[in-house]
């Protein structure tokens, strides 16, 4: 059941603490399963983690689901705001990109990486994140691709995964989201990533029936191998 194992929502605490099984040891990076968490406390903790890290701080991947929320990137404009008042909060963030939507049934993975230590440029990292999603979809016999003019992953022209990063002192945070089994209706109130008329899709609509937790584990493995 999707609700099992979700973290307790709250502020003013380290969201990575709790059940020790939520920390899955890997050679690099470490992986934390945060469960269902409000967007802003997780964003705040990403910034705090990045500001406090040093040359030997392990890289981490955080997997999370968010309650319904629109997030605006630094390139967002007034015309990108939701066209209807559907009660979903809008949060202005410091990530790259424009507007997107997060909600239950979507895998969000935040990539907290030391790019200098990994000798990675931002463009290379974006391509590797896209490649991890594309390879995951290939495992389900779904043809997908990236786009030079619009970071993310697309299936037959419809967006299935979004990317957005922030780099501070050679280290990045934010990451990617993959639509799995969610209500896509809130996307219709925006121009996803600033593109009018851009369609979105998800794995359930493409015939994938695996539980979201299993899909997340597969994606994590791809990401850990690719970065």
Give, region by region, the residue ranges found by the protein language model:
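Short, acidic (Asp/Glu-rich) active-site segment that either coordinates a divalent metal cofactor
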Residues: 102, 172-200
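Short, conserved charged micro-motifs
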Residues: 120-122, 174, 187, 211-215
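A structural signal for short, well-ordered beta-strand segments
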Residues: 109-111, 151, 163-165, 176-180, ...
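Intrinsically disordered, low-complexity repeat regions of secreted/extracellular protein precursors
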Residues: 4-11
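Acyl/amide activation-and-transfer machinery of modular secondary-metabolite enzymes
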Residues: 106-111, 196-204
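Short, conserved beta-strand/beta-arch hydrophobic-aromatic motifs that form part
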Residues: 74-82, 160-180
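N-terminal lobe of the biotin/lipoate ligase/transferase fold
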Residues: 2, 16-20, 26-160, 209
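Well-ordered alpha/beta subsegment
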Residues: 132-141, 203-227
């Amino acid at each position: 059941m999707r609700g099992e194992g979700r973290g307790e929502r709250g502020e003013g605490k380290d969201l990575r603490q709790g059940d020790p099984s939520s920390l899955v040891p890997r050679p690099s990076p470490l992986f934390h399963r945060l469960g269902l968490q409000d967007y802003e406390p997780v964003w705040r903790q990403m910034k705090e983690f990045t500001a406090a890290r040093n040359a030997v701080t392990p890289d981490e991947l955080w997997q999370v689901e968010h309650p319904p929320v629109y997030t605006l990137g630094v390139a967002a404009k007034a015309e990108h705001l939701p066209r209807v008042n559907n009660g979903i909060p809008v949060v202005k963030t410091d990530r790259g990109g424009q507007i997107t939507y997060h909600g239950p049934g979507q895998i969000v993975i935040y990539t907290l990486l030391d790019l200098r230590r990994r000798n990675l440029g931002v463009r290379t990292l974006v391509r590797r994140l896209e490649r991890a999603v594309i390879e995951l979809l290939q495992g389900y016999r779904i043809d997908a691709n990236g786009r030079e003019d619009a970071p993310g992953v697309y299936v037959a022209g419809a967006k299935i995964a979004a990317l957005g990063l922030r780099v501070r002192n050679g280290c990045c945070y934010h990451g990617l989201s993959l639509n799995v089994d969610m209500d896509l209706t809130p996307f219709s109130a925006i121009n996803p990533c600033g593109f009018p008329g851009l369609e979105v899709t998800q794995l359930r609509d493409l015939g994938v029936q695996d539980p979201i937790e299993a899909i997340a584990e597969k994606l994590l493995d791809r990401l850990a191998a690719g970065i």
